[in-house]
Amino acid sequence: MAKGLGKGINALFNQVDLSEETVEEIKIADLRPNPYQPRKHFDDEALAELKESVLQHGILQPLIVRKSLKGYDIVAGERRFRAAKLAGLDTVPAIVRELSEALMREIALLENLQREDLSPLEEAQAYDSLLKHLDLTQEQLAKRLGKSRPHIANHLRLLTLPENIQQLIAEGTLSMGHGRTLLGLKNKNKLEPLVQKVIAEQLNVRQLEQLIQQLNQNVPRETKKKEPVKDAVLKERESYLQNYFGTTVNIKRQKKKGKIEIEFFSNEDLDRILELLSERES
């Protein structure tokens, strides 16, 4: 299955014969969502807009479904299904396909990853599911999805956060940048109060990075030595490296030289960073 990752969905959407013989009108009451759907939240405003489009133009692209014991499972097109329900339709156009459980899972994940904007946490869960069920490495998955290896790795790291913090990211209360930065806190007992401080004071990612650096060094904010103000170029380079390595990076410039500090918090984290460095060299 892993060998053909990505090809199944292209064949399903791009090579389907949309003649009258292949498209059926299926009752909405007989349809149920794909159990492997990674998307947990559907934007109400976006669905309302899609509903208006359905009312004016109908459903332009048929759903892909699979026959089940109690009706049909939606393989692809759950947003169209939900919009059709909101529009009060009784039936929707659909193409029935015979698909295995494994292929259903793959298609559900790939459709969302390729066609819609998942939340960072939903995207991470989709990557995790593909890695586990298709027996792929992060590098293999990145190549087949056309993503970078750091992009996959940085999303997956969110899943190591406590569930309540993952939920805050899923809701949009915290950003992915906040989540990745929180992973750098050494004393995990300080994690919960720190999260509450971020929310209460609406700290941005950069402010959180500075606060975590102080906490990790166990230096009170009031007595911390004031560091030289960095120019815009250094800040830009620093931000780029932090995004690439998924951890705190500090660039220090002196008179005729400088140094780059990359933080890691375990042997596994160090191996991850070294792997990213070796990829840049190859």
From Swiss-Prot:
One GO-annotated biological process of the protein: sporulation resulting in formation of a cellular spore
Main location: cytoplasm
Disruption of the gene: reported phenotype: Increased number of chromosome origins, probably due to early DNA replication initiation. In a double soj-spo0J deletion DnaA transiently arrests for longer at its chromosomal binding sites, not just at oriC.
InterPro entries according to UniProt: Chromosome_partition/occlusion, HTH_ParB/Spo0J, ParB/RepB/Spo0J, ParB/Sulfiredoxin_dom, ParB/Sulfiredoxin_sf, ParB_dimer_C
Annotated localization: Cytoplasm, Nucleoid
One Pfam family linked to the record: ParBc
Gene Ontology MF terms in the entry: DNA binding
GO CC field: bacterial nucleoid; chromosome
DNA-binding region: 139-158
Alphabetical keyword list: Chromosome partition, Cytoplasm, DNA-binding, Sporulation
UniProt cross-references to NCBIfam families, sorted A to Z: parB_part
Functional note: Required for the initiation of sporulation and for normal chromosome segregation. Antagonizes sporulation inhibition by Soj. It probably interacts with a specific DNA site and other proteins involved in partitioning and cell division, and antagonizes Soj in response to cell cycle events related to chromosome partitioning.
Protein family membership: Belongs to the ParB family.
PANTHER family reported in the protein's UniProt record: CHROMOSOME-PARTITIONING PROTEIN PARB-RELATED
This protein's name: Stage 0 sporulation protein J
